[in-house]
Amino acid sequence: MSEMTLNAAEQPIDELVGWVKQHDFSLNLTTERLAFLIAIAVLSNERFDEELGEGELHDAFAIVTRLFDETGEASAFRANNAINEMVKQRLISRFVSEITDGASIYRLSPLAIGITDYYVRHREFSKLRLSIQLSMVADEMAKAIEAAQKGGTPGHWKKNVYGILKYSVGEIFDQIDLNQRVMDEQQQSVKQQIADLLNKDWREAINNCEALLSETSSTLRELQDTLQAASDELQTQILDIQEIVYGDPELEFIEEALFGLQMKLDRITSWGQQAIDLWIGYDRHVHKFIRTAIDMDKNRAFSSRLRQSVKDYFDSPWYLTYADAERLSDLRDEALVLRDDEVTGQVPMEVEYEEFQQVNDELAERIGDMLKAHKDQGAPIDLSVVLRDYLAQHPHTHHFDLARIVVDQAVRLGYSESDYQAVQPDWKAINEFGAKVQANVIDRY
């Protein structure tokens, strides 16, 4: 919020309304009138003194009228009416010069400059512009700190410190804030472009959407990095001046100015991170929409468009890109049961020098007991039970390698009928650390 807005906000609303009514302020800019005002601004920027004669305004009006041919011809009468409307609305100021034999000259008013700046000068919020503005702020703050360290009379503080903080640093902060609002509008424009792409051409929409999303994300990230790097230095400079004026009642107006700058700096910095967070959320939303619409295609909209594209191929040729991934092998096939190779892996230190036959005999004894129970009671052999009992006797760090040995021996001793029926087994825990095994019970041996 600028200083002018702050001063206006402190006044009662009825006084402000009376002031507007007293001066008969009003704005009525049609598209044609706005284009005329922008044309005047462009021509003014090309002039050293930014002054235009009446003939130049007529030329600008003729250029605009050619593009708005439905409104009528570019007559001198219509041009004068348009100029008089601009003067009445305090958008341009008219001066009569004796040097030019009474001919009028025109200049843009501050209101017109503010309007045209929005449409002409602030359409691009770049990292370079932001860096320059932040550099200017740092230089002005350095001047204010130097003046504050020297000290002096209240007049010295008013001129050399307060004046810089309020009219130099504060206005640059307001300009950065305005540029950030322009960036907000650019984001809305990108969102509209993405929406139009998704509604118009599905085949081209995905790549274009990705480019727009990536470009905007990169821009926001660069701007935020620039803001973050500069804000730390500015924060330090504000604190340095606050430390100098702290406790001095005669310099309370300096503290108030610093407080206002602190609020503006916080708002500028927080805007960058908030803009990134909001854009990340929108980015995810768009990607989720694309995945849902294309992968799921519940309403068959994409399918119908594809069929139509195939039908219109000879009128509008296109290329088809497809992916042919390798098939996944089923590990529970006949080869797994009948294979005779050993599972390799690092052997734990405790069993590195242990005879493999000893490990095999121990496993065979356990499985033999279970086979006997299976023979006597018809109970299947559950590999998860064998693994859980055996691994419980060894350290956690050895479980993986030992489990491989157990599985290797188990598949040699028997197999499961369910493997041949393509039955998917459940995952079962084999230790207390989250390890699980997925294997059908052995019921054939």
UniProtKB/Swiss-Prot annotation:
Keywords: Calcium, Cell cycle, Cell division, Chromosome partition, Cytoplasm, DNA condensation. Residues 213-241 are annotated as: Leucine-zipper. InterPro entries: Chromosome_partition_MukF, MukF_C, MukF_C_sf, MukF_M, MukF_M_sp, MukF_WHTH, WH-like_DNA-bd_sf, WH_DNA-bd_sf. Its main location: cytoplasm. GO terms for cellular component: cytoplasm; nucleoid. One of its GO terms (molecular function) is calcium ion binding. SUPFAM superfamilies: MukF C-terminal domain-like (SSF140570), Winged helix' DNA-binding domain (SSF46785). Gene3D superfamilies: Chromosome partition protein MukF, middle domain, MukF, C-terminal domain, Winged helix-like DNA-binding domain superfamily/Winged helix DNA-binding domain. It is found in: Cytoplasm, Nucleoid. GO terms for biological process: cell division; chromosome condensation; chromosome segregation; DNA replication. It comes from the Bacteria. Transmembrane segments: none annotated. It holds the Pfam family MukF_C. Interacts, and probably forms a ternary complex, with MukE and MukB via its C-terminal region. The complex formation is stimulated by calcium or magnesium. It is required for an interaction between MukE and MukB. Involved in chromosome condensation, segregation and cell cycle progression. May participate in facilitating chromosome segregation by condensation DNA from both sides of a centrally located replisome during cell division. Not required for mini-F plasmid partitioning. Probably acts via its interaction with MukB and MukE. Overexpression results in anucleate cells. It has a calcium binding activity. Belongs to the MukF family. This is Chromosome partition protein MukF. It comes from Vibrio campbellii (strain ATCC BAA-1116).
